[in-house]
Amino acid sequence: MREVNFSIPNVNKASVNITTTLYDRRALDCTSTLPLINSLNHLAYLTTSSARIRDILTVDGGIERLVCILKEGRSRDLMEMWKWSLAFQCVVNIGVRGSESVRTRVVEADMVPVIATILDNYIKVVDKARARADSESQRQSSRHHSKAVPTSNDASGRSSFLEQSSTAEQRTSRRHAPPPSIEIPPQPFFQENHVADSNVLDVASPPRVPMTSPPERSTFGQDVHHHRTNEGRFAHGNHRHRMQPLATALPSMDAADGFGLRPVRDNERLPSMLPGFHTGLTSQPDSPTTPNAPVQPRSSAQATIARQRPSLRQQQSASGESDDGNGDGSTMDEDPASTEAAEPIVGLQNRMDIDDVGERDTILGGVSDSHDLTVTDPSEEQEAETFNITHRSTVDGSMINTDNAQNNAALGLSPTQAADNANSPALVPSPYSLYFRDRTTTAAHGVLTTMPRDEDVLMSLQLLAYVSKYCNLRSYFQHSHFVPKLKIDRELQMLEEGTSPIDLPEEEDEYLLPDDVNIFPLVEKFTVRHHSKDMQYWACVVMRNLCRKDESRGGIRQCAYYKCGKWEEFQRQFAKCRRCRRTKYCSKDCQKAAWVYHRHWCHTTP
């Protein structure tokens, strides 16, 4: 048998590969990156469309080989990243679209540690970005506060001075007669100065716009007139009279108004009256192919405001959305009497009410303060029920054809512009990737290339939602570990400012690590509002699967508090949460401790 890397020059590919019509297990053992990417690209399509291929992968060791590719870790090399993403996509396709036996094989192939590491890395990056953003905002606010105190005093002094001066000017204008209007010189004088004015007329100026400011602004800067001679004033006034008659710019007023009209010089105009400012405020076309205009000076301030996000407590008070799968948190102030009357809970001698939980204000206050977010979540405005499991290629502002995107997702196509993902914005850029992208350090870009994408987290949560509903597999989720080669602790350590890079301890072999990681607490963190709604939805599905009864053990349930894990000795031994009637707790202490995160996925049952 020939080597799997043996190439055929006339077709420029490996001799053993996977196509859309042929599956060969030997192609997955290829050690060359490029032919392996080609095979994985076609395998992604096959795992999406063919149930037979998914079944074959569970018995020929294909799933184990794909998981081994994932455990090798993500690299900064473009081709390696592409290979890793395609292998991950294949495993997700097998687990999501496969049968119960196929999903069981995915879990038994040790895919849960890979998912746990991806979720843990994302949480660490989120916490790092939020911590740095909070520290910078506090530093800027303290600096702004120190500068704002003297500025406010000076501003108040200047404003009082201006008010007094304006009052004095108004009183003076009431007492004295209005100043005489400027007379236009006779025609012979204009002819004598025609040569001098012709030089001024040679300079083309933009068309003047009608002045919409009140007539009082025409007297602004009267002290400038004292520095000019009468001849210059007449010549300038005559020039303005020829270029733009004042009668066309201002509405006509009678002589009884109290003052006459005179031309307005450019140095007397307010900034809002200058033609250059009006031309700069013209609306730009909204065509996606038209390049944007240069950023105005105030756009940076607007961008800063746009990238800020209200805290979790403010969102709870301002949000009017329902408490469904989108993941909006619920409060504990509702009276559950009506809910109990509609569907009473049976077999509960030690009934526990959510409203009876003590010290709820302290718990909720601590959670709200600890989950404030200072970065924007761009996916909140999207109401997508599905997601594209392929790479999201970079865009330049042009319109996206949704039909083509869906076809690419079905075919498992990969992008050709993935090389720019670390430096250019994606279709829906993560707020945390935007935060690190603004940092031009090498460490920040290293985190960008190794950190999980939003698509990776979303696919991980979706895969967990499909495989976690089988109670016989729950031990795989509650006793797992992290993959050493997938962890990004070294990259996160390099982000610390003012600290020298330290050598982290050498990575241990994975088989030596204890299975002491429970994946459900990691998933529960994605039910908090500052994550996207899709992440909240699938995380809530996973947490509700934790509350399923185990029919193989007589229909008993497990305590929903992850640190407890106690099982019922008989049916209906534990009390249900009175609000959602899904979770069960063995005691009030477990219920109070679990409410910190359970409140984010505790949805009222109709």
From Swiss-Prot:
Residues 134-188, 203-225, 262-352, 365-384 are annotated as: Disordered. Pfam families: zf-MYND. Residues 149-170, 280-316 have a biased composition (Polar residues). A zinc finger (MYND-type) spans 561-602. The keyword Metal-binding applies. GO terms for molecular function: zinc ion binding. Residues 178-188 have a biased composition (Pro residues). InterPro entries: ARM-type_fold, MYND-type_zinc_finger, Znf_MYND. Residues 321-337 have a biased composition (Acidic residues). Zn(2+) binds at residues 577, 580, 598, 602. It is found in: Cytoplasm. GO terms for biological process: establishment or maintenance of cell polarity; positive regulation of flocculation; sporulation resulting in formation of a cellular spore; ubiquitin-dependent protein catabolic process. One of its GO terms (cellular component) is MUB1-RAD6-UBR2 ubiquitin ligase complex. Keywords: Cytoplasm, Metal-binding, Sporulation, Zinc, Zinc-finger. Its main location: cytoplasm. Involved in determination of the onset of polarized growth and morphogenesis. Plays a role in the regulation of branching in hyphae and spore formation. Belongs to the MUB1/samB family. This is MYND-type zinc finger protein samB. It comes from Neosartorya fischeri (strain ATCC 1020 / DSM 3700 / CBS 544.65 / FGSC A1164 / JCM 1740 / NRRL 181 / WB 181).
